[in-house]
Amino acid sequence: MPLLDSFKVDHTIMPAPAVRRAKGMKTPSGDDITVFDLRFVAPNKEILSSEGIHTLEHLFAGFMRDHLNSKDVEIIDISPMGCRTGFYMSLIGSPDEQRVADAWSASMQDILGVKEQKDIPELNVYQCGTYKMHSLEDAKEIASKVLERRIGVMDNDALALDESKIG
């Protein structure tokens, strides 16, 4: 089975928090689609709590749209990684990594401003598949660490996986 794009980078040297342009492609009509790796914590060193990443999923998607969507960019989806170290963001357009990092930082500030658990969007049995599995406190702690550590930009060439390491 061929390696997927997300597994062609060496996770042992991946910095966090950091933005990586994971993939670019075109729609049939010629529009750019870009996928970003938004790595919150270093792989295999830290892991985001289930409740924290779930709450981030509800908050981050809206706040990123507030800060990044424009005439040349429209976010399609922001989804948590199964490894719980970050999110993938797919969008129409091709913003540079620093623009994405700036929107991410602003979104983390917004998360710190959320007052109460009841202020989390779609936090109900009708709109969320695990509506009781949330922690605003964990989400704020994650946001605070991201801001404290400062978001960097990853270099795909520097992270290229030496496939001989995996046999």
From Swiss-Prot:
Its cofactor is Fe cation. This is S-ribosylhomocysteine lyase. Belongs to the LuxS family. One of its GO terms (molecular function) is iron ion binding. Homodimer. Binds 1 Fe cation per subunit. It is an enzyme of class 4 (lyase). Fe cation binds at H54, H58, C128. The keyword Metal-binding applies. The gene is luxS. Its EC number is 4.4.1.21. InterPro entries: LuxS_sf, Metalloenz_LuxS/M16, S-ribosylhomocysteinase. GO terms for biological process: quorum sensing. Involved in the synthesis of autoinducer 2 (AI-2) which is secreted by bacteria and is used to communicate both the cell density and the metabolic potential of the environment. The regulation of gene expression in response to changes in cell density is called quorum sensing. Catalyzes the transformation of S-ribosylhomocysteine (RHC) to homocysteine (HC) and 4,5-dihydroxy-2,3-pentadione (DPD). Keywords: Autoinducer synthesis, Iron, Lyase, Metal-binding, Quorum sensing. It comes from the Bacteria. It catalyses: S-(5-deoxy-D-ribos-5-yl)-L-homocysteine = (S)-4,5-dihydroxypentane-2,3-dione + L-homocysteine. The keyword RNA-binding does not apply.
